[in-house]
């Protein structure tokens, strides 16, 4: 599985998360900056230049503000849920995950 490393040590706002993830997965310029938009493109859409399987590893997360940690947790939960839906509905596992390291 391909790993995409992101350095979160300088992130201060939730927008920093999206400003790092979107170019890393080759999202088009018009891509939305929300969890729903990420789920649509990562699991369902196929519009990004980087296609599954891949893991996004967020490094340097130990000092992230709480609002960013919550957004990442929400993203991880949503990805797992939609992966499960894809398996159940279409018999296909879309291998995309987010890992967080201190």
Language-model features and meaning:
Residues 41:
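Short acidic/histidine-centered micro-motifs embedded in hydrophobic/aromatic stretches
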Residues 1-29, 44-102:
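N-terminal intrinsically disordered, low-complexity segments enriched in P/E/S/T
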Residues 31-35:
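A short, aromatic/hydrophobic, helix- or strand-capping loop or linear motif
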């Amino acid at each position: 599985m391909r790993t995409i490393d992101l350095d979160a040590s300088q992130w201060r706002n939730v927008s920093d998360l999206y400003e790092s993830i979107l170019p890393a997965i080759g999202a088009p310029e018009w891509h939305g900056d929300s969890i729903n938009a990420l789920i649509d493109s990562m699991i369902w859409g196929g519009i990004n230049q980087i296609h599954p399987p891949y893991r996004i590893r967020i490094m340097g997360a130990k000092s992230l503000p709480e609002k960013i940690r919550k957004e990442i947790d929400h993203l991880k939960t949503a990805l797992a849920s939609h992966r499960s839906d894809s398996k159940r509905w279409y018999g296909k596992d879309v291998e995309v995950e987010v890992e967080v390291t201190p």
